[in-house]
C-alpha cells in the first residue's frame, strides 16, 4: 500500500472511531431496512451500462466541482444512468453520507452505489441507513478475510458489492473470492496515473459470468466504443463533474458528438434536445430545400439550448457574421468554395466564441491532410456530391487522424454504428432522419439514439415505446 493510501486509511480509521461515538450504531440500527433495489441487475439490463458518479473533489485533481448542486445533478443523472455512484469520503473527496437521501429523493429508479474506503462494518450499516443499495470494496486495502466479512454484512442487508481491483494479483483474488461484480480501476494507485488499456488487458482474464465495470479515465464516446467489447459497463465521474454543462457532457459521453442538420421547425429542435443530440444545424443556403431565414431560425431555436451550427455557401462575409451573432451560433459551417482568404477575413469579423467549420470532399481531405485550412476548428467530410445524402467508401479514412473531423453523407440508423467505428470527432445526420425535406421523423431520431446508446442497430419500425435508456 502506497503512502497516499496509507494516509487515507489511517484517517478513515480515525473517522470511524469518531463517528461511532458521535452516531453510535445502536441509535440507528433498528431503523435500517434491507435494500429493495438491485444494483447488479441494473448493470445487466443494458449494454453498456453507466454508473454516473457524484464527486466534488479527489486527491489527484483537488476540487472538481466547487458548487456541487446535488438536485440539479440528480435530475440529469436520472435520465441517463443505470446506477448512480456517490462519493461519501469527507476529507479527500469532500463527500458526505447525507448526499445519498437527497439523490434518492429525486432519482427514484436508479440503485445508489456508495463509494468510500470501507474498512469497518459500521460504515456499511451507515451507508444502508442513508439508503445506499451497493458499496465499493477495494482489494488494495482489504485482505481476503476482511473482504469476506464486509461482503457478508452487505449481502445481509441485500446490498450488492462492486469489488475494485487494480492489477492482476488483485484480480486473481477477486475471482477466487467469487466476486460477482468486478471493477477494473484504470488508475495506478501508486502514482495516480491513468491507463485505460488496463481494462483491455485484465478483462479477458475474468470469467464471463462476472460483471465487469471499467473505472477511471473514461474521457469520450470513442473510448467507450473501444472498451465496450471487454466490459458490461463504465463508472464515470471526474470527467463529467468538471464540465459546466453537465447534461451536454453526459450526452456526448453516452451518444457521441452528433449533429442533426436541416432543422426547420421548433418541434424538431425540442425533440433532438430531449433525446441527447448536441448539435443542431440550420441551413442558410437558399438553394437548399431546408433553407431557413434568420428570423425564422431565431423563433424556432428560442429557449432550446443546443449548440447551433449555421450552414452557409459562398455567402457574404458580413451576413455570415450578422446571423452568427444574432443567433449566438456555436459555429458557422462553410459549405461552398470558400478559400483561405475568405476564412481569414471571416475570422476577423466573427465574435471570438463562434467557431469555423469547413465542409470538404473526402478526396480533397485525403490529398491535403497535412495542408488543410488555417483558422478552421472542425472539418465536415462528405462525398463528392456534398449534401446529396449519399455515403462514400469510409475505408479511405481508416488510417487518417479524425479527431477534428465530423463525418457526413448518407448517415442513418443502419450505418451509424459502422460509422462510429472510424473514431471521428462527430457525425452529421440529415435527410435519412426525415419524413420529408426539413421535417424530421420522431421514430427515426429515437431509434438513432437507441442505436448510438447501445452500439447496435435498432430498427425504428419495431419501436413500440419511447425512452432514453
Swiss-Prot record:
It catalyses: N-(5-phospho-beta-D-ribosyl)anthranilate = 1-(2-carboxyphenylamino)-1-deoxy-D-ribulose 5-phosphate; 1-(2-carboxyphenylamino)-1-deoxy-D-ribulose 5-phosphate + H(+) = (1S,2R)-1-C-(indol-3-yl)glycerol 3-phosphate + CO2 + H2O. One of its GO terms (biological process) is L-tryptophan biosynthetic process. Residues 258-469 are annotated as: N-(5'-phosphoribosyl)anthranilate isomerase. Keywords: Amino-acid biosynthesis, Aromatic amino acid biosynthesis, Decarboxylase, Isomerase, Lyase, Multifunctional enzyme, Tryptophan biosynthesis. The lineage of its organism: Bacteria, Pseudomonadati, Pseudomonadota, Gammaproteobacteria, Enterobacterales. This is Tryptophan biosynthesis protein TrpCF. Gene3D superfamilies: Aldolase class I. HAMAP family: IGPS_B (MF_00134_B), PRAI (MF_00135). Monomer. Bifunctional enzyme that catalyzes two sequential steps of tryptophan biosynthetic pathway. The first reaction is catalyzed by the isomerase, coded by the TrpF domain; the second reaction is catalyzed by the synthase, coded by the TrpC domain. Residues 1-257 are annotated as: Indole-3-glycerol phosphate synthase. GO terms for molecular function: indole-3-glycerol-phosphate synthase activity; phosphoribosylanthranilate isomerase activity. Its EC number is 4.1.1.48, 5.3.1.24. InterPro entries: Aldolase_TIM, Indole-3-glycerol_P_synth, Indole-3-glycerol_P_synth_dom, Indole-3-GlycerolPSynthase_CS, PRAI_dom, RibuloseP-bd_barrel. In the N-terminal section; belongs to the TrpC family. It comes from the Bacteria. Pathway: Amino-acid biosynthesis; L-tryptophan biosynthesis; L-tryptophan from chorismate: step 3/5; Amino-acid biosynthesis; L-tryptophan biosynthesis; L-tryptophan from chorismate: step 4/5.
